[in-house]
Amino acid sequence: MRLCAGLFLSAAALAAHAAALNINFSDAAGKPLLDAVALLEPATGKALVKPMADVEVSQAKRQFAPRVTLITVGTKVTFPNFDTVRHHVYSFSPIKTFELKLYAGVPNAPVTFDKPGVAVLGCNIHDTMAAWIVVTDTPWFARSAANGRARIEGVPAGNYRLRLWHAGLGPGIEPAPVAITVGAADVEHSARLAVSTEP
């Protein structure tokens, strides 16, 4: 009984000391940047991650939604088609190569993303359709909203590497990681990326 109580108290103590990292993303012109990704990795070692449940990247009005999806390694993703036309979804990215040939409705099986990295999605029928799936092996991550803000919650105290990504940076390009120290209080960080959002 004492052991159980001790374990409970230890877990509660960890939760009490967890903080949040708030990132304010902006583009090259200083405007809020949508769909920027922040990945917080331990400075040493690896953190335990579990696959996420019920992740969908849909097709509607000949567009992918969402355009950027952030998942953990091992997550299965379904690709429902809500359009009245058929789509041919594919990725030729090294972390995951697959094709869902001409289909309507929901494919028979989801696609499992079992390696970290970025998978670029396209449609073999509609060339203007594009989306990105960012696969991470850390449990601390976030994607920025339209106001450029992203928030990673529940981060234990310690030293970390902050990795940043945005599709507008180009394939395989990401800024150098930033060293971040998390304590008991929330941490604020601003990131200006060399991305142009002008039409």
Predicted regions: what they are:
Residues 13-16:
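N-terminal signal peptide c-region/cleavage motif recognized by signal peptidases
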Residues 1-8:
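Bacterial N-terminal signal peptides that target proteins for export
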Residues 18-199:
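Extracytoplasmic copper-binding redox domains, predominantly the cupredoxin/blue-copper superfamily
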